[in-house]
Amino acid sequence: MSRILFILLLLIVTQLSELQAAAFSVRQNRFDEVPDLQTPAPLATSTESSKKPEKATSGLLKKCLPCSDGIRCVPQIQCPAHVRMESHEKPQICDLPAGKFGYCCETGQNHTAPKPETSPKERRSGFPTILSPAVLDEARRNFEHLMHGVAQIPVRRGFPDFAHGLVFHSTAKDDLHNFAISNSAIEQVMTTQLFGKKEQVPVEDFITNNVPIKFTETPLAHHCQPPPVCGNIRSVYRSMDGTCNNPEPQRSLWGAAGQPMERMLPPAYEDGIWTPRAHSSDGTPLLGARKISRTLLSDVDRPHPKYNLMVMQFGQVLAHDISQTSSIRLEDGSLVQCCSPEGKVALSPQQSHFACMPIHVEPDDEFFSAFGVRCLNFVRLSLVPSPDCQLSYGKQLTKVTHFVDASPVYGSSDEASRSLRAFRGGRLRMMNDFGRDLLPLTNDKKACPSEEAGKSCFHSGDGRTNQIISLITLQILLAREHNRVAGALHELNPSASDETLFQEARRIVIAEMQHITYNEFLPIIIGPQQMKRFRLVPLHQGYSHDYNVNVNPAITNEFSGAAYRMGHSSVDGKFQIRQEHGRIDEVVNIPDVMFNPSRMRKREFYDDMLRTLYSQPMQQVDSSISQGLSRFLFRGDNPFGLDLAAINIQRGRDQGLRSYNDYLELMGAPKLHSFEQFPIEIAQKLSRVYRTPDDIDLWVGGLLEKAVEGGVVGVTFAEIIADQFARFKQGDRYYYEYDNGINPGAFNPLQLQEIRKVTLARLLCDNSDRLTLQAVPLAAFVRADHPGNQMIGCDDPNLPSVNLEAWRA
């Protein structure tokens, strides 16, 4: 018996060691199927676990007691307050699906647990509770000096910087509106910085929102946006701008366009307020983003053995659906220039705009040095006033709705929506191009960087539509799907009004988008284990009841600034344009079709591009970035472009993202203490660009991880992405699987079952030109040549379709 117990104990110890190693396996130069990447913290902290009530089951396993009534068991990453708790304060451990552990979380999305008023925290924060007129006056003078003294040097058209600025573009009117909003936020931030300096407020108090001083009784109160009055909280249709989704009056702006991002962890701003992260853990300056990019993120061709470019392209459409940031602008709405012409040098402090964070290029740079480039333009993101009208750190603006609601198709405002509608039969406006429906051409001269290319640029619900031709392809597909559905509804209900047909078609297309996202796309990205743990798997029948009025659906800085940028690694540097029988007809370098959509006017190109997306493999998500993005991004007619990898690293620092190690801790996993925990080649490269593992940028660290089982990203990105899509589901009252007790526009049971039939393959068939595309792979995100993924004819009854008879009145 003792021998058996010894063997069982040995097995437990071995399992713990393997789990800890697996969680931080670093990606090699090939795609490996790896063991389950369970975060090891609950198992590793045996002393802590022994204090929690558990009930024994059989053999080696123990089953935790359920959480108390009203308290949910969530993954550690969804209970961020645990990071700041002592071991005896940690929440009760509980069981999650797939054999995982979580916390019985009582603190929700808050970064800290409530503290008693007599705690040292409250005592230390014994500063004034109101803003004095002296502080307000001085802050106002500082702000006006900053605004009036700023250099008004714009980016010139035709340069890569100009094209990069278009990723923040919506309309000229919106750009000026966002300029005013951001200035209001900057004045509040400057007031916060001055108050903090004068009162010597600890950084910790700012980053944890422990400075309960309001702007409401000051001249800055007009910068605060009051929640809208929601006249009909039971509206069947969601609003265009995302307002009034949450039924609580003080939360009616949650998830709406123009609202700030949330954070999983407090920011790493150096002053706790808005100064970018610029120093390593030992106080020395962080190395430049371009140096890290060229050292760690080289271009290596690693085609994914299973998944295709449709994963990359659908992922970008989804990214544009849920987020669009804005860069700080000049007074006339022009883009800010931080470098001299052609990037020869960074502008002097006297000439430089306060929002400049130029990326330094070293003289020995193997690419940019050939062109004399020493500076890449980079401008900080626009801010939005804190929703609680309180002294706080800088919060980044998102211009579109935070929900998965097909906003690239419909826009994120009533005005944008009206510009897209035909106002006949519930349809969207389209351009008839010799019998093919394409998006209408735009009148916006800033939609494309080149005036010549701009003549064929398209108009949609999102200002970034023309960014790359594959994106335009899916935008056309979704617009066509709306009109197909609207036409079918009109045939079924000929007396229905244009407004009813439009809103019903929109409601159906949004549901289709959500179902494809959660049923087909997301499992590929994060793997089946995370889908189960975060309750993201769509039901086969019946309604979900996961809505939580306390969940803010806003995107997080960590998701926007790092984890979801994993898609940049999946981009191939070229499109292999394939004709009907799979023959490669043309190879197109992606920089040549950025903001240059003219090829879409070729009769067969739309079908050929769809075929390319489902046939050509995506690149593996790893530490390799295509040179099309790291050297030639938005080059236009120039011999060089920008470096997207360097931009991503710099953007994380601009947003105050914490280091990679901090997010390991948030997941409940051990921090890295040595570069030697990575494979030797990567460890050597890391040691050349970072002082310690505590300095590794989140985006970089996430790309170095080995993919989770059944997914394409590592465990850290998988957790951050899973958390985000849980927010989108739990915080969206109009999510397609909710019944009418939650969702005023709920589908009836028959309609919901029809929605569950939709697949991306069906949408490809229904909305292709059928010129060269007659069949599709049954699993549209899987390579057409992958074993078991047979091609199926578009007219084959075995390809499911949504029967819209369920919508007959």
UniProtKB/Swiss-Prot annotation:
Disulfide-bonded cysteines: C230-C244, C448-C457, C765-C794
GO molecular function, one term: metal ion binding
Binding positions for heme b per the UniProt entry: H568
Chief location category: secreted
Gene disruption: observed consequences: Females are sterile, and maturing follicles show defects in actin filament formation, nurse cell membrane stability and border cell migration.
Entry GO CC: extracellular space
Listed name of the protein: Chorion peroxidase
Keywords: Acetylation, Disulfide bond, Glycoprotein, Heme, Hydrogen peroxide, Iron, Metal-binding, Oxidoreductase, Peroxidase, Secreted, Signal
Required cofactor names: heme b
Active site: H320 (proton acceptor)
Textual note on the cofactor: Binds 1 heme b (iron(II)-protoporphyrin IX) group per heterodimer.
Site (Transition state stabilizer): R464
Residues of this chain annotated as glycosylated in UniProt: N110
Record carries keyword Cytoplasm: no
Function: Required for ovarian follicle maturation. Involved in the formation of a rigid and insoluble egg chorion by catalyzing chorion protein cross-linking through dityrosine formation and phenol oxidase-catalyzed chorion melanization.
Catalytic activity from the UniProt record: 2 a phenolic donor + H2O2 = 2 a phenolic radical donor + 2 H2O
PANTHER family attached to this UniProt entry: CHORION PEROXIDASE, OXIDASE/PEROXIDASE
Signal peptide: 1-21
GO BP field: chorion-containing eggshell formation; egg chorion assembly; follicle cell of egg chamber development; hydrogen peroxide catabolic process; hydrogen peroxide metabolic process; prostaglandin biosynthetic process; response to oxidative stress
Protein EC: 1.11.1.7
Gene name tied to this protein: Pxt
CDD domains: peroxinectin_like
UniProt-annotated stretches for the region Disordered: 36-55
Residue numbers of N-acetylcysteine PTMs: C224
Localization, UniProt: Secreted
Tissue expression as described in the entry: Expressed at low levels in the germarium and early follicles. Expression becomes progressively stronger during vitellogenesis, and is highly expressed in germ cells and somatic cells. A subset of follicle cells, termed border cells (BC), exhibit a high level of expression.
